[in-house]
Amino acid sequence: MAEIRSRQLDFSEESQEERRRYLRSKPVPLVRNGAGDLWMVDRHHRLRALLELDSRVSTYGYVIAEVESHDRSDVLRELQRRGWLYLHDGRGKGPCPPEQLPSSLLDLEDDPYRSLVWKLKKEGVLRPQPLIPYHEFRWGAWLRSRPLPPFHSGFLDPALPAARRLARSAAASHLAGWKGEA
């Protein structure tokens, strides 16, 4: 939720024209099924932030793949096959069956480790990887397996020093976006 709250602050300070320009520069990658339904592959946090501010918001997108089937299960299987689903809950438990994914962005669970990774990216500890969906969650899962002091998405400070050290360590070198020592 840390990224969502930060983006909401940014969006609330922008004019409608500034917001439109920003959204045009960050289109949402989509998968379209045979019925014409669209599935988001990335930008979930950004759009959730906007939806919470304005439930009628619209954005720009582009289709990166098409799945002929009309069946939701077939589409979910294809997304999973391509690595375009993250099937863990906010506590890192999973994988859960794809059919249990929420159908609304507003129903996605908070993952404090994903928030921690967002903060590390924002600080420049991690390199952005726009072509690798869900790499932030992979980082979060990795950090979750390491000892960190108690924290939550609204209060990341206790975990940041240890998370920075871990993210720069050689043990993290297999993760997309790793930069190593500063």
Predicted regions located by residue number:
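Short hydrophobic beta-strand that contains or immediately precedes a catalytic carboxylate
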Residues: 39-42
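Surface-exposed, charge/polar-rich loops and edge strands
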Residues: 1-21, 25-37, 51-182
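Active-site-adjacent structural elements in enzyme catalytic domains
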Residues: 44-46
